Amino acid sequence: PLEVIVRNIAAGSFSKRLGVAEGTILAEPTIEFSYKNDALGDPFINDSYAKALGLATEQEIETIKKYAFKVNEVLKSMFLNANLKLIDFKIEFGRFHGDIILADEISPDTCRLWDVNTNEKKHIKKYLEEFLERNNNKE
């Protein structure tokens, strides 16, 4: 499988690698690929590497990008409704009977989220516990 990371705001390894201040809003969402291989530490690769290694064709890479950016639009909107910024997320794609498919989950656990108002980093499990506690106390 090909791991895909979509970033909206600079954070984590992106900030460290490129010297961009954490929290910098990117001019447009970026996409990064990594070769899903635990023994190698899932190294970053580019489109050419993916094609050369037989991980994806040019057309499949375009399909993956289209799907990844569409997922980004949906997740950004969904999390914004919960007062959360979608900083970045990772998903994996692979082939099944010749078709490009999502090969892993899309979940809050694969997303980096910050509070819209405070930029506080949100750990989704803790956030959900707090949310449920607040809503249970309203009854």
Where is each model-derived feature located?
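Acidic/polar, glycine-anchored loop/turn motif associated with catalytic or activation segments
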Residues: P1-D88, G94-E139
